[in-house]
C-alpha cells in the first residue's frame, strides 16, 4: 500500500475560465495558469506522483515548456496514472479538498464527482470531495489538496 499527497493553488482573475475536476465551471473568475489551471487535477497528479517518488507536475510538465501552454490537466493526470500503473499500482481511493470563496461548488458536486470517477476510473464511493471557503482570507485564489491510496 502507498499513500500520496498533492497540493496546488492558483490566483483567480476576472474573465478567465475556471476548470475543476476536468469540468468548466460557470464563474466570473478563473485560474491564472500556464495550463488550464485545474487545481483539483494538478493536486491529484502530484499525489499520484508522490506515492512513487516520481517528482511533481512541474518536473514532468514544466511551465517553461510551450507545449503545455493551455493544456488540459486531464493530460497530466492520465500520464501520472500511466506511470504508477506501470509500476503495478492500482488506485484504490482518492480524497480531495477544494478551497475557494466563489463560485459556490455545492450545485456542481454531482458533476464533479462524476468527472473524477471517469478520469480516475474509480467508483464514486471511492472518491471523497470536500468544499471549503477561505472565510475571506484568500478570496482571489483556489486551492486543492489531494490524498490517494494505492495498492502495489
Curated annotation (Swiss-Prot):
Molecular function GO labels: 2-C-methyl-D-erythritol 2,4-cyclodiphosphate synthase activity; metal ion binding
Pfam families: YgbB (PF02542)
Keywords on record: Isoprene biosynthesis, Lyase, Metal-binding
Self-association and partners: Homotrimer.
Residues annotated for 4-CDP-2-C-methyl-D-erythritol 2-phosphate binding in this entry: 8-10, 34-35, 56-58, 61-65, 100-106, 131-135
GO terms classed as biological process: isopentenyl diphosphate biosynthetic process, methylerythritol 4-phosphate pathway; terpenoid biosynthetic process
Organism the protein comes from: Thermus thermophilus (strain ATCC 27634 / DSM 579 / HB8)
Pathway annotation: Isoprenoid biosynthesis; isopentenyl diphosphate biosynthesis via DXP pathway; isopentenyl diphosphate from 1-deoxy-D-xylulose 5-phosphate: step 4/6
Catalytic activity as recorded in UniProt: 4-CDP-2-C-methyl-D-erythritol 2-phosphate = 2-C-methyl-D-erythritol 2,4-cyclic diphosphate + CMP
Keyword Lyase among UniProt keywords: yes
Residues binding a divalent metal cation, per UniProt: 8, 10, 42
Temperature dependence: Thermostable.
Entry function: Involved in the biosynthesis of isopentenyl diphosphate (IPP) and dimethylallyl diphosphate (DMAPP), two major building blocks of isoprenoid compounds. Catalyzes the conversion of 4-diphosphocytidyl-2-C-methyl-D-erythritol 2-phosphate (CDP-ME2P) to 2-C-methyl-D-erythritol 2,4-cyclodiphosphate (ME-CPP) with a corresponding release of cytidine 5-monophosphate (CMP).
InterPro entries: MECDP_synthase, MECDP_synthase_CS, MECDP_synthase_sf
Entry cofactors: a divalent metal cation
Family: Belongs to the IspF family.
Entry's cofactor comment: Binds 1 divalent metal cation per subunit.
Stretch forming the signal peptide: none
EC number(s) from the headed UniProt entry: 4.6.1.12
Protein known as: 2-C-methyl-D-erythritol 2,4-cyclodiphosphate synthase
Site description Transition state stabilizer, residues in chain: 34, 133
Amino acid at each position: 500500500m502507498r499513500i500520496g499527497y498533492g497540493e496546488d493553488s492558483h490566483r483567480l482573475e476576472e474573465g478567465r475560465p475556471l476548470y475543476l475536476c476536468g469540468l468548466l465551471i460557470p464563474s466570473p473568475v478563473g485560474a491564472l495558469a500556464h495550463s488550464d489551471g485545474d487545481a483539483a487535477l494538478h493536486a491529484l497528479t502530484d499525489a499520484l506522483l508522490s506515492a512513487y517518488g516520481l517528482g511533481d507536475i512541474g518536473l514532468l510538465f514544466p511551465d517553461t515548456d510551450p507545449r503545455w501552454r493551455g493544456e488540459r490537466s486531464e493530460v497530466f493526470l492520465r500520464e501520472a496514472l500511466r506511470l504508477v500503473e506501470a509500476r503495478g499500482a492500482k488506485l484504490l481511493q482518492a480524497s480531495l479538498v477544494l478551497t475557494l470563496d466563489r463560485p459556490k461548488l455545492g450545485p456542481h458536486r454531482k458533476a464533479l464527482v462524476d468527472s473524477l470517477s471517469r478520469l480516475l476510473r474509480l467508483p464514486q464511493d471511492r472518491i471523497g470531495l470536500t468544499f471549503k471557503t477561505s472565510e475571506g482570507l484568500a478570496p482571489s485564489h483556489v486551492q486543492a489538496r489531494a490524498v490517494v491510496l494505492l495498492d502495489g
